[in-house]
Amino acid sequence: MIKLIEKKKEFDDFFKDDIFYIRIMSLLKAYSTNYNFALFYKQLDDNGNITSIISRLDNDYTVCHNDDFDLLELEDFFTRIGFNSILGDDELALSFSYDYGIIMRTNKKVEKIINYATIDEYPKLMDLFNLEDYSTADFESWYVDVSHRIRHSCAKAVTLNVNDEIVSSGIFSSIYNNDAILTSVSTVPEFRRMGYGSALVSAMICDIKGKVYLMRDKNKNEKFYKKLGFENMGYWRMYK
Protein backbone atom coordinates (compact mmCIF):
# COMPACT_ATOMS: atom_id res chain seq x y z
CA MET A 1 0.00 0.00 0.00
CA ILE A 2 1.25 3.50 -0.85
CA LYS A 3 -0.17 6.36 1.21
CA LEU A 4 0.26 10.13 1.18
CA ILE A 5 1.55 11.26 4.57
CA GLU A 6 -0.08 14.09 6.49
CA LYS A 7 2.56 14.69 9.19
CA LYS A 8 6.36 14.68 9.22
CA LYS A 9 6.51 12.19 12.08
CA GLU A 10 5.04 9.49 9.84
CA PHE A 11 8.57 8.88 8.51
CA ASP A 12 10.07 8.51 12.00
CA ASP A 13 10.09 4.70 11.84
CA PHE A 14 12.10 4.58 8.61
CA PHE A 15 15.85 5.08 8.19
CA LYS A 16 18.43 4.26 5.57
CA ASP A 17 22.01 5.50 5.43
CA ASP A 18 22.08 6.69 1.83
CA ILE A 19 21.87 9.72 -0.44
CA PHE A 20 18.19 9.27 -1.28
CA TYR A 21 17.15 9.29 2.37
CA ILE A 22 19.01 12.58 2.88
CA ARG A 23 17.41 14.06 -0.22
CA ILE A 24 13.88 13.13 0.87
CA MET A 25 14.23 14.02 4.55
CA SER A 26 15.89 17.35 3.79
CA LEU A 27 13.01 18.24 1.48
CA LEU A 28 10.51 17.21 4.16
CA LYS A 29 12.33 19.33 6.74
CA ALA A 30 12.28 22.33 4.39
CA TYR A 31 8.66 22.15 3.26
CA SER A 32 6.98 19.82 5.76
CA THR A 33 3.54 18.72 4.53
CA ASN A 34 2.24 22.25 4.06
CA TYR A 35 2.49 22.63 0.27
CA ASN A 36 0.69 20.87 -2.55
CA PHE A 37 3.79 20.97 -4.78
CA ALA A 38 5.90 19.05 -2.22
CA LEU A 39 4.26 15.75 -1.37
CA PHE A 40 5.50 12.69 0.51
CA TYR A 41 4.38 9.08 0.39
CA LYS A 42 5.12 5.90 2.31
CA GLN A 43 4.91 2.33 1.07
CA LEU A 44 3.67 -0.14 3.69
CA ASP A 45 3.83 -3.92 3.86
CA ASP A 46 0.99 -6.13 5.12
CA ASN A 47 2.10 -5.54 8.72
CA GLY A 48 2.06 -1.75 8.38
CA ASN A 49 5.85 -1.41 8.27
CA ILE A 50 7.35 1.23 6.00
CA THR A 51 9.32 -0.35 3.15
CA SER A 52 9.99 2.79 1.11
CA ILE A 53 9.53 6.54 1.29
CA ILE A 54 8.88 8.81 -1.68
CA SER A 55 9.13 12.56 -2.18
CA ARG A 56 7.53 14.58 -4.95
CA LEU A 57 8.65 18.11 -5.78
CA ASP A 58 6.44 19.41 -8.57
CA ASN A 59 6.43 16.20 -10.65
CA ASP A 60 9.94 14.97 -9.83
CA TYR A 61 10.15 11.97 -7.48
CA THR A 62 12.85 10.47 -5.27
CA VAL A 63 12.56 6.95 -3.83
CA CYS A 64 14.38 5.49 -0.83
CA HIS A 65 13.64 1.86 0.02
CA ASN A 66 14.72 -1.03 2.22
CA ASP A 67 15.25 -4.64 1.17
CA ASP A 68 11.57 -5.56 1.55
CA PHE A 69 10.07 -2.93 -0.75
CA ASP A 70 7.47 -3.87 -3.35
CA LEU A 71 8.91 -3.01 -6.76
CA LEU A 72 5.81 -4.01 -8.72
CA GLU A 73 3.61 -1.80 -6.56
CA LEU A 74 5.92 1.16 -7.17
CA GLU A 75 5.89 0.46 -10.91
CA ASP A 76 2.09 0.50 -10.90
CA PHE A 77 2.02 3.65 -8.75
CA PHE A 78 4.22 5.65 -11.12
CA THR A 79 2.46 4.32 -14.20
CA ARG A 80 -0.88 5.51 -12.87
CA ILE A 81 0.20 8.83 -11.38
CA GLY A 82 2.65 9.92 -14.08
CA PHE A 83 5.97 11.69 -13.55
CA ASN A 84 8.59 14.00 -14.99
CA SER A 85 11.46 12.09 -13.38
CA ILE A 86 12.10 9.38 -10.77
CA LEU A 87 15.42 9.21 -8.91
CA GLY A 88 16.59 6.12 -7.04
CA ASP A 89 19.27 3.44 -6.82
CA ASP A 90 19.82 0.63 -9.30
CA GLU A 91 17.68 -1.76 -7.24
CA LEU A 92 14.73 0.42 -8.19
CA ALA A 93 14.58 -1.47 -11.50
CA LEU A 94 11.52 0.08 -13.14
CA SER A 95 10.58 -0.60 -16.77
CA PHE A 96 10.86 3.05 -17.86
CA SER A 97 13.85 4.44 -19.79
CA TYR A 98 16.60 5.94 -17.65
CA ASP A 99 20.01 7.55 -17.39
CA TYR A 100 22.45 6.39 -14.74
CA GLY A 101 25.64 7.39 -13.00
CA ILE A 102 27.78 6.89 -9.91
CA ILE A 103 27.10 7.75 -6.26
CA MET A 104 30.16 8.87 -4.28
CA ARG A 105 30.63 9.52 -0.57
CA THR A 106 33.25 10.85 1.84
CA ASN A 107 33.66 11.71 5.49
CA LYS A 108 37.33 12.68 5.22
CA LYS A 109 38.08 16.23 6.30
CA VAL A 110 41.22 17.70 4.73
CA GLU A 111 41.09 21.44 4.16
CA LYS A 112 43.28 22.94 1.45
CA ILE A 113 44.57 26.47 1.73
CA ILE A 114 45.00 28.68 -1.32
CA ASN A 115 46.62 32.06 -0.90
CA TYR A 116 44.75 35.17 -2.01
CA ALA A 117 41.39 33.35 -2.04
CA THR A 118 38.50 33.71 0.41
CA ILE A 119 35.38 31.66 1.13
CA ASP A 120 31.99 33.40 1.03
CA GLU A 121 29.33 31.39 2.85
CA TYR A 122 26.55 33.86 2.05
CA PRO A 123 26.86 34.65 -1.67
CA LYS A 124 24.17 36.24 -3.78
CA LEU A 125 22.21 33.47 -5.46
CA MET A 126 21.97 35.44 -8.69
CA ASP A 127 25.77 35.27 -8.97
CA LEU A 128 25.68 31.48 -8.56
CA PHE A 129 22.89 31.09 -11.08
CA ASN A 130 24.90 33.01 -13.66
CA LEU A 131 28.01 30.90 -13.00
CA GLU A 132 26.39 27.46 -12.92
CA ASP A 133 24.93 25.63 -15.88
CA TYR A 134 21.23 26.20 -15.27
CA SER A 135 20.32 26.62 -18.92
CA THR A 136 17.12 24.61 -18.48
CA ALA A 137 16.10 26.24 -15.20
CA ASP A 138 13.96 29.27 -14.55
CA PHE A 139 15.76 31.68 -12.20
CA GLU A 140 12.70 32.68 -10.21
CA SER A 141 11.60 29.12 -9.40
CA TRP A 142 15.22 28.07 -8.74
CA TYR A 143 15.78 31.07 -6.46
CA VAL A 144 12.57 30.52 -4.49
CA ASP A 145 13.39 26.85 -3.88
CA VAL A 146 17.09 27.26 -3.01
CA SER A 147 16.59 30.32 -0.80
CA HIS A 148 13.75 28.55 1.04
CA ARG A 149 15.97 25.54 1.71
CA ILE A 150 18.83 27.75 2.88
CA ARG A 151 16.57 29.63 5.31
CA HIS A 152 15.53 26.28 6.81
CA SER A 153 19.16 25.06 7.08
CA CYS A 154 18.46 22.37 4.49
CA ALA A 155 20.87 23.69 1.85
CA LYS A 156 23.93 25.91 1.59
CA ALA A 157 25.61 27.89 -1.18
CA VAL A 158 29.32 28.73 -1.06
CA THR A 159 31.74 30.57 -3.32
CA LEU A 160 35.51 30.94 -3.48
CA ASN A 161 36.54 34.48 -4.38
CA VAL A 162 39.73 36.08 -5.64
CA ASN A 163 39.95 39.87 -5.48
CA ASP A 164 36.25 39.93 -4.57
CA GLU A 165 35.27 38.05 -7.72
CA ILE A 166 33.79 34.54 -7.78
CA VAL A 167 36.10 31.97 -9.32
CA SER A 168 34.40 28.82 -8.04
CA SER A 169 31.04 27.91 -6.51
CA GLY A 170 29.24 24.95 -5.03
CA ILE A 171 25.91 24.08 -3.43
CA PHE A 172 24.82 21.58 -0.84
CA SER A 173 21.35 21.02 -2.28
CA SER A 174 20.30 18.86 0.68
CA ILE A 175 21.43 18.87 4.32
CA TYR A 176 19.93 16.60 6.95
CA ASN A 177 21.20 15.34 10.32
CA ASN A 178 24.76 16.54 9.66
CA ASP A 179 24.97 14.81 6.25
CA ALA A 180 24.83 16.63 2.92
CA ILE A 181 24.58 16.24 -0.85
CA LEU A 182 27.04 18.22 -2.95
CA THR A 183 25.82 19.52 -6.31
CA SER A 184 26.56 22.21 -8.86
CA VAL A 185 30.33 22.63 -8.41
CA SER A 186 31.65 25.02 -11.04
CA THR A 187 34.79 27.07 -11.71
CA VAL A 188 35.17 30.01 -14.08
CA PRO A 189 36.95 28.63 -17.20
CA GLU A 190 40.05 30.83 -16.95
CA PHE A 191 40.61 29.72 -13.34
CA ARG A 192 40.34 25.97 -13.92
CA ARG A 193 43.23 23.56 -13.19
CA MET A 194 44.59 25.99 -10.61
CA GLY A 195 43.28 24.23 -7.50
CA TYR A 196 40.39 26.57 -6.76
CA GLY A 197 37.63 24.02 -7.31
CA SER A 198 39.26 21.38 -5.11
CA ALA A 199 39.98 23.98 -2.41
CA LEU A 200 36.32 25.01 -2.36
CA VAL A 201 35.04 21.42 -2.22
CA SER A 202 37.49 20.56 0.57
CA ALA A 203 36.34 23.57 2.60
CA MET A 204 32.70 22.62 2.07
CA ILE A 205 33.33 19.02 3.18
CA CYS A 206 35.06 20.28 6.34
CA ASP A 207 31.98 22.37 7.12
CA ILE A 208 29.79 19.24 7.34
CA LYS A 209 30.09 17.13 10.49
CA GLY A 210 28.90 13.92 8.85
CA LYS A 211 29.10 12.41 5.38
CA VAL A 212 29.00 14.21 2.05
CA TYR A 213 27.45 12.51 -0.98
CA LEU A 214 27.33 13.39 -4.66
CA MET A 215 26.01 11.96 -7.90
CA ARG A 216 28.26 12.15 -10.94
CA ASP A 217 27.98 11.09 -14.55
CA LYS A 218 29.39 7.61 -15.07
CA ASN A 219 32.38 8.76 -17.14
CA LYS A 220 33.17 12.12 -15.54
CA ASN A 221 35.16 13.61 -12.66
CA GLU A 222 36.07 10.36 -10.87
CA LYS A 223 39.76 11.26 -10.42
CA PHE A 224 38.92 14.78 -9.24
CA TYR A 225 36.61 13.59 -6.48
CA LYS A 226 38.75 10.60 -5.47
CA LYS A 227 41.64 12.99 -4.81
CA LEU A 228 39.31 14.78 -2.38
CA GLY A 229 38.56 11.57 -0.48
CA PHE A 230 35.36 10.45 -2.20
CA GLU A 231 34.72 6.77 -2.90
CA ASN A 232 32.30 5.13 -5.31
CA MET A 233 29.27 3.77 -3.43
CA GLY A 234 26.93 2.45 -6.13
CA TYR A 235 24.71 3.65 -8.93
CA TRP A 236 21.88 6.14 -9.28
CA ARG A 237 19.13 5.95 -11.87
CA MET A 238 17.03 8.78 -13.23
CA TYR A 239 13.87 7.62 -15.00
CA LYS A 240 12.24 10.02 -17.43
Regions found by a protein language model. Name each.
Residues 19-37, 135-157, 161:
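Active-site rim helix/loop that mediates acceptor-substrate recognition in acyltransferases
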Residues 144-189:
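Hydrophobic secondary-structure block in the mid-to-C-terminal portion of proteins
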Residues 69-76, 187-189, 193-207, 227:
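Conserved acetyl-CoA-binding loop-helix of GNAT-fold acetyltransferases
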Residues 1-24, 107-142:
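Short amphipathic alpha-helix that is part of the acyltransferase structural core
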Residues 91-99, 198, 218-236:
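Conserved active-site alpha-helix within GNAT-family acetyltransferase domains
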Residues 45, 50-117, 236-240:
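Acyl-donor-binding surface of acyltransferase catalytic domains
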Residues 82-90, 208-218:
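Conserved GNAT acetyl-CoA-binding A-motif
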Residues 19, 25-78, 167-183:
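Conserved donor-binding loop and adjoining core beta-sheet/short helix segment
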